[in-house]
Regions:
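Extended alpha-helical targeting/anchoring segments
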Residues: 1-434
Length: 434
């Protein structure tokens, strides 16, 4: 699938990939095909493309209502619909009172019509091509391209990416201390602060080749690569923002992190699960997500069906829970985005005040980082990740970010170390040995 994306990016611009083998959450990989119309929100907050109206989510809902159709055949999740990219600064539309720094990317949000897909089921090993009515030609072209394509790019060595420049540590420590002052004053309870790394893109290396290295160095259940408007988004995210399947909705918050150590996992996991700080932060964010789902769901249907499980990834251990509910019949995809975006685990609590504080303390737009990407199917099903463990390639430069949640008893130096642990796998894709 990655080979098709690399060779024919105009026909197959998006791969939604589960690169974490053996994890039940990332069951399907989807190569989206047949790109057509678009709805785009630019960095000047102007809307382009499909529909009328002043808001991205409203236009998306109107477009979906016009095009909606039946669910795809079981067990497949997609047989036509939309690719969705939601940059972090879409938060300014979701919460109009926010005044955030501008996005560093030309596209803040994108809904891109896709008429077909090549899908692989990691559970059964089956692969199929599905297309919506009227898109048989797209499916036939996909079938022909699949038969003729060469091997996918592998995670082999690349030339040096050039010097990797890390944001000044003291700048981050100062932001942490400022956040702690706000917490002590009762302004917020928790705030997720991020920092940035930049490097020249490795010469002669395509985004697909770089993505192959990323998913090998840092596998994630909600990975993917998307190319549009001279930007490539490469993600190896472990975190789901939201899934809607039928009338069931799930969100899966991650909060609580420890690095994996060469000496073994047991001590690190024991410290993580015993930490009163990490447990309190996690429970607070579960409550935030329950509140978000409560705005959408039938009364009494919201519940936590997985509580504080530990998941181990290539470079870190995380505490993870799952919150689910039964959607009301009147809830639309745009309403789901408005209620849950951006994710509470990468903003803080209370969410709106935290987003304003993050903008003030970080001082620059986040772009793709802590936004979301995924699909919306014709029947209203959707699946979106949170864009963490993600790099952006644009204009010959690669940028990535990592953050940590600041709470009352945070140690700024520990939080600085946590950002480095989270960034480690992404940096290794660029050739870093740290």
């Amino acid at each position: 699938m990655l080979a098709l994306h690399e060779q024919y990016p105009e026909r197959y611009p998006v791969l939604l990939d589960s690169s974490a083998a053996g994890r039940p959450l990332g069951r399907f990989t989807l190569l989206l095909a047949g790109p057509e119309g678009r709805l785009l929100l630019d960095q000047d907050r102007r809307l382009h493309g499909e529909g009328n109206g002043d808001h991205f989510c409203d236009r998306l809902d109107a477009w979906w209502q016009r095009e909606r159709g039946p669910a795809p055949p079981a067990p497949w999740p997609f047989a036509g619909g939309w690719f969705l990219y939601l940059g972090y600064e879409l938060a300014s539309e979701v919460e109009p009172s926010l005044r955030l720094p501008p996005s560093p990317l030309p596209v803040v949000a994108l809904a891109w019509r896709m008429r077909a897909a090549l899908l692989h089921d990691h559970s059964s090993g089956a692969t199929t091509i599905l297309a919506e009515p009227g898109a048989a030609g797209v499916a036939e072209r996909l079938r022909s391209d699949l038969q003729a394509i060469g091997p996918a790019p592998g995670p082999g060595p690349i030339g040096a990416a050039g010097a990797i420049v890390e944001d000044e540590p003291e700048q981050y420590l100062e932001a942490c201390r400022a956040a702690l002052a706000h917490i002590a004053a009762g302004d917020v309870y928790q705030a997720n602060l991020a920092r940035c790394w930049r490097a020249p893109a490795p010469e002669g290396v395509t985004p697909a080749k770089l993505y192959a290295r990323l998913r090998a160095a840092n596998p994630g259940a909600f990975s993917g690569i998307a190319g549009f408007d001279d930007v490539a988004i490469l993600s190896s995210s472990p975190e789901r923002l939201v899934r809607v399947s039928g009338r069931r909705i799930d969100t899966r918050p991650i909060a609580g992190t420890r690095p994996r150590l060469a000496s073994g996992d047991a001590a690190s996991i024991a410290e993580l699960t015993a930490s009163a700080k990490e447990r309190a932060e996690h429970v607070m964010l579960i409550d935030l997500e329950r509140n978000d789902l409560g705005r959408l769901c039938e009364p009494g249907s919201v519940r936590v069906d997985e509580f504080m499980a530990v998941e181990s990834y290539a470079h870190v251990h995380h505490i993870v829970s799952n919150v689910c509910g039964q959607l009301r019949d009147d809830v639309t995809p745009g309403a789901v985005i408005r209620a849950l975006f951006p994710g509470g685990t990468i903003t803080g609590c209370p969410k709106v005040r935290c987003m304003q504080l993050i903008g003030d303390l970080e001082g620059k737009g986040r772009g793709a980082y802590t936004g979301a990407m995924g699909y919306l199917a014709l029947d209203g099903s959707l699946d979106l990740n949170i864009l963490i463990r993600t790099m952006t390639v644009r204009g010959g430069e690669v940028e990535l970010r990592a953050g940590a949640g600041i709470v009352a008893d945070s140690d700024p130096l520990h939080e600085l170390d946590e950002t480095r642990a989270k960034a480690r796998g992404v940096l290794r894709a660029l050739g870093s040995t740290g």
